[in-house]
Regions:
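Bacterial N-terminal signal peptides
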Residues: 1-10
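Glycan-processing catalytic domains of CAZymes
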Residues: 14-351, 357
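Extracellular calcium-associated, cysteine-rich motifs in secreted modular proteins
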Residues: 339-394
């Protein structure tokens, strides 16, 4: 595949078809992260929790970034168009309708908004247009942020016509508008912005959902978000925590895929308008204050069983969770009963001809890492590891 496809935006700026969810059913989306550039700093090593627990290195200081696993394509920055394209190919195979861009840690005064969200977002928009021109499908976008950031997002994106085709729309009776997800500070969204969007609050671990409130994290049986007397949204998780994933006595692990299976059974039972899967590629977490007993603490991930990403990883799962997701979605969208034999099928060797269980297409496989930053050359946008993307250097 030509590098120019990934690195140069189309001059024709191919528009996408507007996607309106109003009259559709059995829609499936997934939470998606673009914050990975925050972990790449000059002279700061990539920290992998699995390797550290196996005796390979030490935990970093409080607030330092740690990956729970190495992605199958190797470590990558959040603005890497080639990796996004690889993800979108997988989403097309799995029939993912929309992705939810996680900006929940960003506020108007956040100093890293560009690196965390805005730069990856612009890369993603260009990629979607290139894919459209090439005849490839892309999921539409829903942004999820604090309500306090809604005004800035509206001024920057929602109010501009050049972005109107990338959103996922929903009509509540006053015309189809882009869906926007707020944290629980939904009251901080200015009225003039609220009127231009279809707004839902979304947070987790709340068994009693308020009006227009969705959830991204729940134990089975997951609560159902209702709207106009009908089931509107339900979350499906691979694993989840009560407070910290490192608190394994209270967290719910993957259980070799059984947690994912159980949560999907709830979706097949309820069949809401929207199923949201948690998560695709959060991948990393900051070290928190140690527990009173000295236990290192991470909020959203720790050992493989106490993590929740579906993106293919080097070890130990390969692309197993992607295959499970793909086949659950296939049956769900066809209106079939839930398949009960997937765990037995997919614990075996991958059935995907372009994967060898490391999650990398045979066409793009490669391991050379010239600058030793943990990112293989084919995905590396900062080839001298100085913290400045090559595209910005003279």
């Amino acid at each position: 595949m030509a590098l120019i496809f990934f690195l140069v935006s189309s001059l024709r700026a191919q528009s996408l078809e507007i996607e309106d969810a109003t009259d559709q059913k059995n829609l499936v989306g997934i939470n998606y992260s673009t914050w990975h550039s925050l972990a790449f700093r000059k002279n700061i090593p990539i920290r992998n929790i699995q390797e550290i627990l196996s005796g390979g290195g030490q935990f970093g200081p409080r607030a330092s970034w740690h990956f729970w696993a190495e992605p199958a394509v190797g470590y990558y920055r959040g603005d890497n168009a080639m990796v996004m394209d690889y993800h979108f190919d997988l989403f097309e195979q799995a029939q993912i309708d929309f992705i939810i861009l996680d900006a929940t840690n960003l506020f108007p005064d956040s100093k890293k908004k560009d690196e965390y969200l805005y730069e990856p977002f612009e890369v993603m928009v260009k990629l979607m247009r290139n894919r459209e021109e090439a005849g490839k499908q892309s999921p539409r976008i829903i942004i999820w942020s604090p309500g306090l950031l809604a005004n800035e997002l509206h001024a920057r994106y929602f109010s501009k016509s050049e972005y109107k085709d990338i959103w996922f729309y929903l009509d509540e009776g006053k015309g189809a508008k882009p869906i926007f997800l707020s944290r629980l500070d939904i009251d901080k969204i200015p009225n003039q912005v609220n009127r231009q969007l279809t707004v839902r609050a979304m947070w987790g671990l709340n068994t009693n959902l308020a009006d227009r409130e969705w959830s991204f994290l729940e134990n089975y049986p997951q609560p159902v978000a209702m709207f106009d007397g009908k089931p509107e949204q339900l979350v499906v998780c691979t694993a989840l925590q009560k407070n910290y994933m490192t608190n394994e006595d209270l967290a719910t692990p993957r259980k070799g895929g059984k947690t994912f299976q159980l949560q999907w059974s709830r979706a097949f039972e309820i069949r809401p308008k929207f199923v949201i899967i948690t998560w695709w590629n959060e991948l990393m977490a900051q070290r928190q204050k140690d527990a009173p007993n000295g236990q290192v603490q991470f909020t959203d991930m720790f050992r493989p069983e106490y993590s929740r990403d579906i993106e293919p990883v080097q070890s130990p799962y390969g692309d197993m969770y992607f295959r499970l997701m793909r086949d659950y979605i296939k049956a769900y969208k066809k209106g079939e009963s839930m398949p009960t034999n997937l765990l037995e099928l997919h614990r075996k060797e991958s059935d995907r001809l372009d994967f060898d269980m490391d999650g990398i297409s045979n066409l793009i496989e490669g391991t050379k890492d010239s600058d030793g930053d943990g990112i293989s050359d084919q995905w590396d946008l900062d080839s001298d590891n100085d913290g400045i993307p090559d595209s910005r250097e003279k």
